[in-house]
From Swiss-Prot:
The name this protein goes by in its record: Ubiquitin carboxyl-terminal hydrolase calypso
Subunit structure: Catalytic component of the polycomb repressive deubiquitinase (PR-DUB) complex, at least composed of caly/calypso, Asx and sba (MBD5/6 homolog). The PR-DUB complex associates with nucleosomes to mediate deubiquitination of histone H2AK118ub1 substrates; the association requires the positively charged C-terminal tail of caly, probably due to direct binding of DNA. Interacts (via ULD domain) with Asx (via DEUBAD domain); the interaction produces a stable heterodimer with a composite binding site for ubiquitin.
Gene for this chain: caly
Origin species: Drosophila persimilis
A Gene Ontology biological process term: epigenetic regulation of gene expression
Biased composition (Basic residues): 461-475
Record lineage: Eukaryota, Metazoa, Ecdysozoa, Arthropoda, Hexapoda
């Protein structure tokens, strides 16, 4: 599913020009890299598809390696420790359901400047950048200590603190590291579409059907909705003491989808930004292997103590040998063996889960290579080789035949094959029974006439003469 961002809420050309000088000087300190105007960034910002693998690799390119993105298929299914949610929906300005949503969300706008500056809320002033905006809205509002943002995002968060939403959007749009990482995951068709339209900052508008990303994140005990095409962030309120913030999010999404689908269907996609599953699995494996070593060592000591007791050498035990775990009241050898077996099973399961996650991450990269590779040269070369060999015209004519004609020919071919098979089967059966088929009798008649003309004896001519004699007697 392609994403087309821009349109309503984008900055005008005059606003962008007025802020270009300020924006370039700002980013020199914000990113620590040589900056350039948006018009000089390679090809501008391109459309991205809504794919969790793409978003995960995009986060890695941003420098954030401890996070992944997962697609959510069931809102009722619990999700472990999400940082935030990204909601992709179809944007149609003229639709009634859209107006209902606007009327509903207008009541929860946060217009206090101090409250807005305390969070990371950036207006989308660059077309096709809503995917990056959605990811940054989740990550830069996360207060988790174990979340490593990386150098680029950390500098961006520090140097844009206290800025207006519009200036934050300009900072995102003119950060070369973000733009290059974003465009590296675009399909070749997106680049060609941008070249045909020549879309700029102010010229890219929503036309027909477009898709847009928004973020839902918990901030200071409140559920916020951050949409770069809205003038203000939206506060959906808090949640109960016995609830998790995801419960509040489920209620908001159920209400949102109920309004949007009241008159016609709406296509949407929901993704969750969560910690990298491999980190938790690796930590669990480390703990399980430590416990496995402890249980295995205790079991060996217990078995050794039993052997020494049976041989009468128990008094030779070293005084410094720990005996706490060897007491009968702790664990028996059978209990330790059962515990060790359970640990082995858990380790095998988690090793398989870790292998699956690594394979999944590898497939993300394979899919990204296939998605971003330009196959135009290969296709042109392949067609040229077919034409050079003289088979291209025949292949094209075969595939251009009407489907009915092809199906009729196929049916005729099937009937002809069935008749041939039936004839051969009948011939074989007749030969086995000593009966000559009718078709073979007709073929043998010329040979019979030839034998008659040659006056060779045969049963058939004798029968014919006998019949003629009977006719003469009747006369």
């Amino acid at each position: 599913m392609n994403v087309a961002a821009g349109g309503p809420g984008t900055a005008s050309a005059s606003t962008t020009a007025a802020n270009s000088i300020f924006n370039n000087s700002l980013l020199a300190s914000a990113t620590g890299a040589t900056t350039m105007p948006m018009a000089q960034l390679a090809d501008g910002w391109l459309e991205l598809e809504s794919d969790p693998g793409l978003f995960t690799l995009l986060l890695e390119d941003f420098g954030c390696h401890d996070v992944q993105v997962e697609e959510v298929y069931d809102l009722q299914k619990p999700i472990e420790s999400p940082y935030g949610f990204i909601f992709l929906f179809r944007w149609i300005e003229e639709r009634r359901a859209r107006r209902k949503i606007v009327e509903t969300t207008a009541e929860i706008f946060v217009k206090d400047e101090e409250a807005i500056s305390s969070i990371f809320f950036a207006q989308q002033v660059v077309p096709n950048s809503c995917a990056t905006h959605a990811l940054l809205s989740v990550l830069l509002n996360c207060n988790e200590n174990n979340l490593q943002l990386g150098d680029t995002l950390s500098r961006l968060k520090v140097h844009t603190k206290g800025m207006s939403p519009e200036n934050k959007g300009l900072a995102i749009g003119n950060t070369p590291e973000l733009a290059c990482a974003h465009n590296s995951h675009a399909i070749p068709q997106a680049r060609r579409r941008l070249e045909r339209t020549g879309a700029g900052v102010a010229s890219c508008r929503f036309t027909g059907e477009a898709f847009h990303f928004v973020s839902f994140v918990p901030i200071s005990g409140q559920l916020f909705e951050l949409d770069g095409l809205k003038p203000y962030p939206m506060n959906h309120g808090g949640w109960e003491d016995h609830e998790d913030w995801t419960d509040k999010f489920r209620r908001v999404m159920a209400e949102r989808l109920g309004i949007a689908t009241g008159e016609q269907d709406i296509r949407f996609n929901l993704m969750a930004v969560v910690p990298d599953r491999r980190i938790a699995i690796t930590h669990k494996l480390k703990m399980l292997r430590t416990n496995q070593a402890i249980v295995s060592g205790t079991l060996q000591k217990l078995l050794k103590a039993d052997e020494q007791g049976e041989s009468g050498n128990g008094d030779q035990q070293r005084p410094d040998t720990p005996t706490t775990l060897l007491e009968p009241s702790a664990f028996t050898a059978k209990d330790l063996q059962l515990l060790l077996k359970n640990l082995d099973t858990e380790i095998a399961i988690n090793e398989q889960n870790l292998a699956d996650e690594n394979d999944r991450r590898h497939m993300f990269k394979v899919d990204a290579s296939r998605r971003t590779h330009n196959y135009d040269k290969f296709i042109c070369t392949f067609l040229s080789m077919l034409a050079h060999q003289g088979v291209l015209g025949e292949l094209v004519s075969q595939h251009l035949l009407p489907s009915k004609k092809v199906s009729g020919q196929s049916a005729a071919n099937r009937i002809s094959k069935q008749n041939s098979a039936a004839s051969s089967a009948g011939a074989n059966a007749g030969a086995a029974a000593g009966v000559t088929p009718k078709s073979q009798q007709q073929q043998q008649q010329p040979q019979t006439a030839a034998s008659k003309n040659g006056k060779s004896p045969g049963k058939t001519p004798g029968r014919r003469r006998k019949g003629r004699n009977k006719c003469r007697k009747r006369k």
